């Protein structure tokens, strides 16, 4: 079976890091001010990414999926419980990410959020169909585009914006660190689904953690800077104020696709621990369809706390 290279793993986790969810989380750190906000981001990500690296090594060296690796500590029945919870939370996160991405895209181009749900869902299906070991070329193009576009966004926020406003002391430094740790920890139940496919799993775990950590910090900083320098907390308005327009739309859509793809794909892999006969890729496609449908018909604003509750089991 074809294995993924270090470069391919770096691309996968670059895509995971470029996320509107991470930008929005960065805006929440604005009460700390610029200096303390940056420090909280760095401290939180160092802690979170060390744990992410260790999780990747455990599953990667043993060529086990994230859920199968829990058998070592919790046995077969424990593994089933974790797998069911993981599939449940990943279906939920797939729906939420599609929903949030569609709302942000519709904030730039008002064609109806449901249309953007369909577009994002179809693109995720394309990513899944190509497969994790064959994504090299398509991921390279997508990541180069996202890299250039986010550089443009960073230039607007940090060099063309106003002076930073002072923090309000409404948030403790510890709370800020917790927010920064949250994103790396959210990938703990997923990372070995990808490092197990790597040619060099330990190096792939290290590269994945470092790339994700750097890019995630960058996204947090964009969010923090947007809140402090532009006074905006809405991702669509941030893009419009930056004068990005269609470019901003591409950032929103493709960052949502490259992040949510990992949720849907890992839901399929986790399901193999529950029903081994079911093909992981097929289940991932079903999860994407279900998530897209849910994002269209159900307001996703009120289930985030429930998903965080499930996710806390893995942290």
Task: Show where each model-derived region lies.
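Transmembrane helix-loop boundary segments of multi-pass membrane transporters
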Residues: 26-39, 103-117, 133-141, 235-247, ...
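Membrane-interface "cap" regions at the ends of multi-pass membrane proteins
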Residues: 1-36, 134, 172-177, 189, ...
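Extracellular loop-to-transmembrane helix junctions
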Residues: 27-57, 78-80, 212
């Amino acid at each position: 079976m074809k294995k993924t290279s270090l470069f391919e793993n770096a691309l996968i986790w670059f895509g995971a890091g470029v996320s509107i969810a991470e930008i929005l989380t960065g805006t929440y750190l604005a009460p700390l001010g610029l200096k303390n906000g940056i420090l909280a981001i760095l401290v939180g990500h160092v802690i979170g990414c060390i744990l992410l690296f260790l999780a990747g090594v455990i599953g990667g060296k043993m060529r086990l999926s994230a859920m199968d690796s829990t058998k070592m500590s919790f046995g077969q029945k424990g593994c089933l419980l974790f797998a069911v919870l993981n599939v449940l939370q990943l279906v939920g996160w797939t729906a939420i990410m599609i929903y949030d991405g569609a709302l942000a895209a519709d904030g730039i181009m008002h064609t109806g959020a449901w249309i953007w749900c369909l577009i994002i869902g179809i693109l995720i299906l394309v990513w899944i169909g190509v497969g994790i070991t064959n994504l090299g070329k398509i991921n390279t193009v997508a990541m180069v585009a996202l890299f250039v576009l986010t550089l443009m966004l960073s230039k607007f926020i940090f060099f063309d914006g106003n002076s930073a406003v002072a923090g309000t002391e409404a948030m403790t430094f510890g709370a800020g660190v917790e927010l920064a740790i949250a994103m790396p920890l959210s990938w703990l139940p997923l990372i070995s689904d990808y490092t197990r496919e790597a040619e060099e799993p330990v190096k792939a775990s290290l590269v994945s953690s470092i790339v994700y950590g750097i890019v995630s910090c960058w996204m947090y900083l964009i969010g923090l800077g947007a809140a402090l320098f532009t006074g905006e907390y809405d991702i669509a308005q941030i893009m419009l104020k930056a004068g990005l327009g269609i470019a901003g739309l591409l950032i929103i859509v493709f960052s949502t696709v490259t992040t949510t793809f990992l949720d849907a794909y890992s839901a399929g892999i986790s399901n193999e621990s529950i029903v081994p006969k079911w093909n992981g890729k097929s289940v991932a496609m079903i999860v994407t369809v279900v998530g897209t449908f849910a994002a269209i018909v159900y307001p996703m604003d009120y289930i985030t706390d429930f998903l965080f509750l499930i996710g806390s089991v893995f942290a």
